[in-house]
C-alpha cells in the first residue's frame, strides 16, 4: 500500500514537472517569459558538437557508398551487423570480370593470342578484386568503425546530457517565474528555496555537459588519425592496382605485334581485281607477307626471313607431331615459314623442329 502511494506521488510530481516545463517553453516561444542563456563558450561547444555529428554522418555514409556501390549489398551487410552475424562472402565485380575473362580465354584456347591475353587480363582483374576486398576490410576497421562509434556512442551521450541540460534550464526559469509571482512571505521563501535548488542542478548539469563537449577536440584528433589510416589504405590499394596493370601492360606489350588480332588477315589491304587466276593468285601470295605492318621484332624476323632466339614463357605440350613441346625459360631458335598461320612460328631445338605458338615466346635481341 505504501509503495502504491509512493508511485502515485512520484507520478503526480513527474506530471507536474512536465507541465511546468511545457508552460515555460511555450511562454518563451511566445515571448512572455525570460530565458536563461547559456554562456558563449558552452554554446560554441554545442555548435561544434552538432557540426561534427552532421559531417561525420555524411562522410561515413558516402565512404560506405564508395567502398560498396551496391545498395542491396549495403542493406544486407547492415542487417547482418544488427543481427550480430557475419555477412556471407560474395564475389566482387573485378573478381567476377576476371573469372569471365579466364573462362573465355580458356574457351578460345590459351594457345591463341586473344585467349592468352584474356587469361592474363582475367588473372590481373582477380588480383585487383582481392586488393579491393582488402581495402574495404581495412577501411571499415580503421575508418568507418571509429566514425560509427562516435555517432552511436559518444554523440548519443552528448545528446542525452544536452536534453537533460535543457530540462534543468526550463526548471530554473520556471522557478524564477514563480518567485516573481510570489506575494506571500511564506510562498516567496518556498520559491527562493526552489530557485536555489534548480540553480544548483542547472549549474551541475551545465558542467557535466561542458566536460563532455570539450572531448570533441579529442574526437577530432582521433578521427584525424583514422583519416590518415584511410588515406594510407587507399594509397596501398591504388599502388597495387597500378603495379598490377603495369605488369599486365608489360606482358601484353611484350607480345609480338600480331597479338593484337587472332585473325589479322582481315587487316590485309584488299587485293585488286585481276584479269586472270594467275594474277590473282600472285597478288594474294604477295600480300600474305604484309599482314604485319607495325615495325616490331616479329615483323623484322618475317621480312628478313632469318632466325631469332626466343625465350619460352610457359610450358607447352605439343598437340601433334607437327608441333614442338616447350619448357618455361628455355631458349630456342625460331623462324617464320611462308604460309604458316600468323599465331605460330617454326621452332628449333637441337635436331628437334616443330611449330610453336608465338604467345608462349619472347623474342630476344
UniProtKB/Swiss-Prot annotation:
InterPro entries, per the entry: AH/BAR_dom_sf (IPR027267), BAR_dom (IPR004148), Endophilin_SH3RF (IPR050384), SH3-like_dom_sf (IPR036028), SH3_domain (IPR001452), SH3GLB1_BAR (IPR035695), SH3GLB_SH3 (IPR028503)
Keyword Coiled coil set for record: yes
Residues carrying Phosphothreonine: 145
Annotated keywords: Acetylation, Apoptosis, Coiled coil, Cytoplasm, Cytoplasmic vesicle, Golgi apparatus, Lipid-binding, Membrane, Mitochondrion, Mitochondrion outer membrane, Phosphoprotein, SH3 domain
SMART domains from the UniProt entry: BAR, SH3
GO cellular component, one term: mitochondrial outer membrane
Chain segments carrying region Required for membrane binding: 1-37
Span list, region Membrane-binding amphipathic helix: 1-30
N-acetylmethionine sites (modified residues): 1
Start and end residues of each SH3 domain: 305-365
Domain BAR: 27-261
Gene Ontology MF terms in the entry: lipid binding
Main location: cytoplasm
Example GO biological process: apoptotic process
PTM remark: Phosphorylated at Thr-145 by CDK5; this phosphorylation is required for autophagy induction in starved neurons and facilitates homodimerization.
CDD domains from the UniProt entry: BAR_Endophilin_B1, SH3_Endophilin_B1
Annotated compartments: Cytoplasm; Golgi apparatus membrane; Mitochondrion outer membrane; Cytoplasmic vesicle, Autophagosome membrane
Coiled-coil annotated residue ranges, if any: 155-195
Topology of the protein relative to the lipid bilayer: Peripheral membrane protein
Record note on domains: An N-terminal amphipathic helix, the BAR domain and a second amphipathic helix inserted into helix 1 of the BAR domain (N-BAR domain) induce membrane curvature and bind curved membranes.
PANTHER family for this protein: ENDOPHILIN-B1, SH3 DOMAIN-CONTAINING
Family stated for the protein in its record: Belongs to the endophilin family.
Annotated function: May be required for normal outer mitochondrial membrane dynamics. Required for coatomer-mediated retrograde transport in certain cells. May recruit other proteins to membranes with high curvature. May promote membrane fusion. Involved in activation of caspase-dependent apoptosis by promoting BAX/BAK1 activation. Involved in caspase-independent apoptosis during nutrition starvation and involved in the regulation of autophagy. Activates lipid kinase activity of PIK3C3 during autophagy probably by associating with the PI3K complex II (PI3KC3-C2).
Subunit text: Homodimer, and heterodimer with SH3GLB2. Binds BAX; induction of apoptosis augments BAX binding. Binds DNM1, HTT, AMPH, BIN1 and ARFGAP1. Interacts with UVRAG; UVRAG bridges the interaction to BECN1 indicative for an association with the PI3K complex II (PI3KC3-C2).
Protein known as: Endophilin-B1
Organism listed in the record: Bos taurus (Bovine)
Amino acid at each position: 500500500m505504501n509503495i502504491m502511494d509512493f508511485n502515485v506521488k512520484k507520478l503526480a510530481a513527474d506530471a507536474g514537472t512536465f507541465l511546468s516545463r511545457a508552460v515555460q517553453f511555450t511562454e518563451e516561444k511566445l515571448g512572455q517569459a525570460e530565458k536563461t542563456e547559456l554562456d558563449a563558450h558552452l554554446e560554441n561547444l554545442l555548435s561544434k558538437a552538432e557540426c561534427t555529428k552532421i559531417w561525420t554522418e555524411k562522410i561515413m555514409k558516402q565512404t560506405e557508398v564508395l567502398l560498396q556501390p551496391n545498395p542491396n549489398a549495403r542493406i544486407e551487410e547492415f542487417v547482418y551487423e544488427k543481427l550480430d552475424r557475419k555477412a556471407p562472402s560474395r564475389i566482387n565485380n573485378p573478381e567476377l570480370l576476371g573469372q569471365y575473362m579466364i573462362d573465355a580465354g580458356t574457351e578460345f584456347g590459351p594457345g591463341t593470342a586473344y585467349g592468352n591475353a584474356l587469361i592474363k587480363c582475367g588473372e590481373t582483374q582477380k588480383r585487383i578484386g582481392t586488393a579491393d576486398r582488402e581495402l574495404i576490410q581495412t577501411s571499415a576497421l580503421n575508418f568507418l568503425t571509429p566514425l560509427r562509434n562516435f555517432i552511436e556512442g559518444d554523440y548519443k551521450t552528448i545528446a542525452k546530457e544536452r536534453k537533460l541540460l535543457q530540462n534543468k534550464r526550463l526548471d530554473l526559469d520556471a522557478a524564477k517565474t514563480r518567485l516573481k509571482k510570489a506575494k506571500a512571505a511564506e510562498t516567496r521563501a518556498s520559491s527562493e528555496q526552489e530557485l536555489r535548488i534548480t540553480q544548483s542542478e542547472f549549474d551541475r548539469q551545465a558542467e557535466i555537459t561542458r566536460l563532455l563537449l570539450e572531448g570533441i577536440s579529442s574526437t577530432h584528433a582521433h578521427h584525424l588519425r583514422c583519416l590518415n589510416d584511410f588515406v594510407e589504405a587507399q594509397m596501398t590499394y591504388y599502388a597495387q592496382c597500378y603495379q598490377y596493370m603495369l605488369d599486365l601492360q608489360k606482358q601484353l606489350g611484350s607480345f609480338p605485334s600480331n597479338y593484337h588480332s587472332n585473325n589479322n588477315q582481315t587487316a590485309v589491304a584488299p587485293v585488286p581485281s585481276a584479269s586472270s587466276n594467275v594474277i590473282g593468285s600472285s597478288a594474294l601470295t604477295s600480300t600474305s607477307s604484309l599482314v604485319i605492318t607495325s615495325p616490331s621484332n616479329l615483323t623484322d624476323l618475317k621480312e628478313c626471313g632469318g632466325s631469332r632466339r626466343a625465350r619460352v614463357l610457359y610450358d607447352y605440350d605439343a598437340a601433334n607431331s607437327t608441333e614442338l613441346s616447350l619448357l618455361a625459360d628455355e631458349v630456342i631458335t625460331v623462324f617464320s615459314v611462308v604460309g604458316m598461320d600468323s599465331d605460330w612460328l617454326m621452332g628449333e631445338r637441337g635436331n628437334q623442329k616443330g611449330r610453336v605458338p608465338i604467345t608462349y615466346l619472347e623474342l630476344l635481341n
